Amino acid sequence: MGKGEFTFNLLCCYNREAETLTNKPVKLLIAASGTGGHLFPAIAIANQLKDYHIEWLGVPDRLETKLIPSQYPLHTISVEGFQQKLGIETLKVLSRLIGSILKVRHILKEGKFQGLFTTGGYIAAPAIIAARYLGLPVILHESNVLPGKVTRWFSRLCNVVAVGFEEGTKYLSFEKTVYLGTPVREEFLFPQSLDLPIPENVPVIVIVGGSQGAVAINQLVRKCIPAWVENGAWIIHQTGENDPNAFSLKHPQYFTLPFYHNMASLFQRANLVISRAGAGSLTELAVTHTPSILIPYPYAADNHQAYNAKIFSNQNAALVFTEGELTPEKLQTEVLELLQSSEKLEKMSLGAESLAVKDSHKKLAGLVHEILSH
């Protein structure tokens, strides 16, 4: 089956009900853990598959224990990263991996699950191996341009790999790789109200550091705030919960928030966003058509955030700077120049829009239906 035919079939099948001989709902296990970039797309898919019985595979004490909706029973296993070099620690990791595989196999078998959907990351390794051992279909979604280690190593065990960026297909030599975009939370697809006392016709800068925050960006930004507010900007700064200096600066036009419940409203209102370059945040910037300044996290695995950011830079959707090259003076100047040029911001907005796949959640749900109906 060719790539085009495969994509056509999965889109056509989305509106079909999941069919079983017993008329019981299809049971699907979703393996997604760790960060918002892994969890939010998986939650979007789960919410789209209302005719399925869905349960979740996660890790204790990770973000999923707080974010996963209560209607999805949560199973937990212990997983950890793979070592770069062979040694005694590698053997320990492999031993624990085998234990995790056996536990996932037990969950899948006892629960009589009919398939696995995963968004990659370390939890995907034992989940994929266990599912394939039992002969169950596996759908893997990779949101980053440069696929993670687990995706690269285990994609051939999957029935299909869906990628969030079209550029990502060239890094996977696997014929059943399809570009479907990355699903976003439903609120990003509809107008949201911002419940902060900000006047309507003022420029708004939003600073975010991903679901974990970014102390380095916070420190950089705080040195620029006085000049920005002096030039009329209002600033919403989501600092994350690990910044000891989060509330060190106060100004009526500056809102400091460790966490904000409705990121969609922030991005929709923002004239400019300053952010890391995680795939989840970039997808949200694309669907809200929001101009951005991106500062890729320099210690991300395989420098994958730089690959994500390059796509936005190539489409004129963002300005991209490394953390090392960006001084407070440079950031201050770049932001003020953008805010003073509606033409530049409009061009960046159109660039972001060109990268959006707003129906990704429907396409990916269609893919799940297609694979599990065979």
Curated annotation (Swiss-Prot):
Coiled-coil residue spans: none
Protein location: Cell inner membrane
One GO cellular component term: plasma membrane
Reaction catalysed by this enzyme: di-trans,octa-cis-undecaprenyl diphospho-N-acetyl-alpha-D-muramoyl-L-alanyl-D-glutamyl-meso-2,6-diaminopimeloyl-D-alanyl-D-alanine + UDP-N-acetyl-alpha-D-glucosamine = di-trans,octa-cis-undecaprenyl diphospho-[N-acetyl-alpha-D-glucosaminyl-(1->4)]-N-acetyl-alpha-D-muramoyl-L-alanyl-D-glutamyl-meso-2,6-diaminopimeloyl-D-alanyl-D-alanine + UDP + H(+)
Pfam families: Glyco_tran_28_C, Glyco_transf_28
E.C. no: 2.4.1.227
Protein name: UDP-N-acetylglucosamine--N-acetylmuramyl-(pentapeptide) pyrophosphoryl-undecaprenol N-acetylglucosamine transferase
InterPro entries: GlcNAc_MurG, Glyco_trans_28_C, GlycoTrans_28_N
Keyword Cytoplasm: no
Lineage of the organism: Bacteria, Bacillati, Cyanobacteriota, Cyanophyceae, Oscillatoriophycideae
Enzyme class at the top of the EC tree: transferase
Membrane topology value: Peripheral membrane protein
Tagged with keyword Cell membrane: yes
Family recorded in the similarity comment: Belongs to the glycosyltransferase 28 family. MurG subfamily.
GO-annotated molecular function: UDP-N-acetyl-D-glucosamine:N-acetylmuramoyl-L-alanyl-D-glutamyl-meso-2,6-diaminopimelyl-D-alanyl-D-alanine-diphosphoundecaprenol 4-beta-N-acetylglucosaminlytransferase activity; undecaprenyldiphospho-muramoylpentapeptide beta-N-acetylglucosaminyltransferase activity
Its job: Cell wall formation. Catalyzes the transfer of a GlcNAc subunit on undecaprenyl-pyrophosphoryl-MurNAc-pentapeptide (lipid intermediate I) to form undecaprenyl-pyrophosphoryl-MurNAc-(pentapeptide)GlcNAc (lipid intermediate II).
GO terms classed as biological process: carbohydrate metabolic process; cell division; cell wall organization; lipid glycosylation; peptidoglycan biosynthetic process; regulation of cell shape
Pathway where this protein functions: Cell wall biogenesis; peptidoglycan biosynthesis
Annotated UDP-N-acetyl-alpha-D-glucosamine binding sites: 35-37, 144, 185, 211, 305
Keyword annotations from UniProtKB, A to Z: Cell cycle, Cell division, Cell inner membrane, Cell membrane, Cell shape, Cell wall biogenesis/degradation, Glycosyltransferase, Membrane, Peptidoglycan synthesis, Transferase
Primary localization class, coarse: membrane
